[in-house]
Amino acid sequence: MDTFQVIILALIQGLTEFLPISSSAHLILPAQLLGWEDQGLSFDVAVNTGSLFAVVIYFRNELWAMFKAWIASMVKGQHSDDSKLAWWIILATLPAVFFGFMAKDFIETHLRSAGVIAVTTVVFGLLLWWADKMSRRDLTVYQTGWRKALLIGFAQALALIPGTSRSGATMTAALMLGLSRDAAARFSFLMSVPVSLGAAILVGKDLAESPLPIDYQALTLGTVISFVAAYLCIHYFLKIISRMGMTPFVIYRLILGAVLCGFIFL
């Protein structure tokens, strides 16, 4: 990839990773418009790592409090709201880990297509709208509970299908289960940390063993740009949903799905 392509794709990834609009749907548009080839798994991991750094730094105080409380719960048997939240995040991670191992090759081979992404972009956009309009939305992140956490975890596993949007699927599930918009977003952001970290480690291992050359300069640039874009995105997204809800993102998903369908069928 040339530098321009790296910048554009990293910006897209960083700006869309934590919005409920599907980063994979946006990453396929440059390929359709400009004839770019698939950026490959190594670049996906690089820009996802940049996004991971962004959420860790943005929520550093919450994550540190959760980590200390989690350790205390195991060493001293002391349980607090933060330790419970940490355990719920771990529990919510398990479905994605399991299905990621089981279905990784199938997804890469059969579901990474424009048609699948177009359909899931629209369908899960409508589900997000329904959840935002019809649900209670009055629970805080500390009222999630292990049952709700596990169900949100299964939604995250479903988001392994390209176009679904990890943040979109998890926020939809959280809203359906009664979490407030802010709580749904924060739980979704926090549960992205272990999944993204695990995926980066696993794929990084595969890349290290691969005989193919790796463009480390492009990967580093992509990571930095994705980090900056994702950090700003998290900050402003939390402000937007408190004022306007999810409707702007639902409308955007429907338009994006229609555009993708246009590229496919016209």
Curated annotation (Swiss-Prot):
One of its GO terms (biological process) is regulation of cell shape. The keyword Nucleotide-binding does not apply. It is found in: Cell inner membrane. Pfam families: BacA. Its EC number is 3.6.1.27. It is an enzyme of class 3 (hydrolase). Coiled coil: none annotated. Its main location: membrane. It catalyses: di-trans,octa-cis-undecaprenyl diphosphate + H2O = di-trans,octa-cis-undecaprenyl phosphate + phosphate + H(+). GO terms for molecular function: undecaprenyl-diphosphatase activity. It is a multi-pass membrane protein. One of its GO terms (cellular component) is plasma membrane. InterPro entries: UppP (IPR003824). Catalyzes the dephosphorylation of undecaprenyl diphosphate (UPP). Confers resistance to bacitracin. Bacitracin is thought to be involved in the inhibition of peptidoglycan synthesis by sequestering undecaprenyl diphosphate, thereby reducing the pool of lipid carrier available. Belongs to the UppP family. This is Undecaprenyl-diphosphatase. It comes from Shewanella sp. (strain ANA-3).
